[in-house]
C-alpha cells in the first residue's frame, strides 16, 4: 500500500478491532452537510499522486518517492485510471484518502493547486498528511459509536466527532493536530479497550 509522509500511529491494533466489531458505520454528519469522508477526486489536486510513496512490487509497477509526481499523472488526473490494475497498480485502486485530499484543496487552500502554484507544494503535502490523520480518526470514532459505550463515553465520542467534522481547518491547525487533539482522541480510544474482547491484548 502507499506510504504517506508524516503520519502517526493512531493505535493501529485498536483501530482494526473496533472497525471489525462495528460493521455498520454510523452516519454522524448532519444531512445538510456533505460527508467529510467522501472522496471526490474532481475537487482535489491529485495530492495522493504527489505526496505518497510506493515501492515496485505486487501493488505498484515502479518506485515513487514522496513529493515526486507520479509519472502517470496528467494534469489533475491519472492517465491510466481506467486500467490501473491491468497496468500494475492495484494499490492505487485500493487506496482511499477518506476525503482528505478534496477537503485540503477546497477548505484549506481555497481550490488552489500545487501544479499552478508550485510554492504551495510542500504546504499542501503536509496538510494532506495531517488531514488524513484527522479523517482516520473520524472514521474510527464513527465506528466506536456502534459499540456498547457508556453514556459518558458516547458523549465524548460525539464531541470529538463534532470538532473534527465541523471545524474549518487551517494549515497551522493541521500542523498542530498530531501533537494536540489527536493525542486526546488516541487516549480516549485506548480507554475503550474495556469494551473489546478480554483476550485482545494477549501476546501484544
What is each stretch, according to the model?
Residues 4-6:
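Hydrophobic alpha-helical membrane-insertion segments
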Residues 29-47, 53-204:
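Short loop/turn segments that flank or connect secondary-structure elements
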Amino acid at each position: 500500500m502507499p506510504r504517506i509522509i508524516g503520519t502517526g500511529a493512531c493505535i493501529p491494533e485498536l483501530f482494526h478491532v473496533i472497525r471489525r466489531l462495528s460493521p455498520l458505520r454510523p452516519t454522524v454528519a448532519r444531512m445538510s452537510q456533505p460527508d467529510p469522508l467522501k472522496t471526490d477526486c474532481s475537487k482535489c489536486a491529485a495530492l495522493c499522486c504527489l505526496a505518497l510513496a510506493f515501492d515496485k512490487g505486487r501493488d505498484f509497477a515502479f518506485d515513487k518517492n514522496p513529493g515526486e509526481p507520479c509519472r502517470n499523472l496528467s494534469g489533475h488526473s491519472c492517465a491510466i485510471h481506467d486500467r490501473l490494475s491491468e497496468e500494475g497498480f492495484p494499490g492505487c485502486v485500493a487506496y482511499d484518502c477518506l476525503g482528505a485530499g478534496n477537503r485540503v484543496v477546497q477548505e484549506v487552500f481555497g481550490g488552489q493547486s500545487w501544479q499552478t502554484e508550485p510554492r504551495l507544494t510542500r504546504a499542501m503535502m503536509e496538510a494532506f498528511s495531517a488531514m488524513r490523520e484527522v479523517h482516520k480518526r473520524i472514521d474510527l470514532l464513527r465506528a466506536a459509536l456502534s459499540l456498547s459505550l457508556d453514556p459518558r463515553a458516547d458523549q465524548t465520542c460525539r464531541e470529538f466527532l463534532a470538532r473534527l467534522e465541523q471545524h474549518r481547518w487551517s494549515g497551522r491547525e493541521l500542523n498542530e493536530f498530531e501533537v494536540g487533539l489527536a493525542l486526546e482522541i488516541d487516549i480516549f480510544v485506548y480507554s475503550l479497550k474495556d469494551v473489546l474482547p478480554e483476550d485482545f491484548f494477549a501476546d501484544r
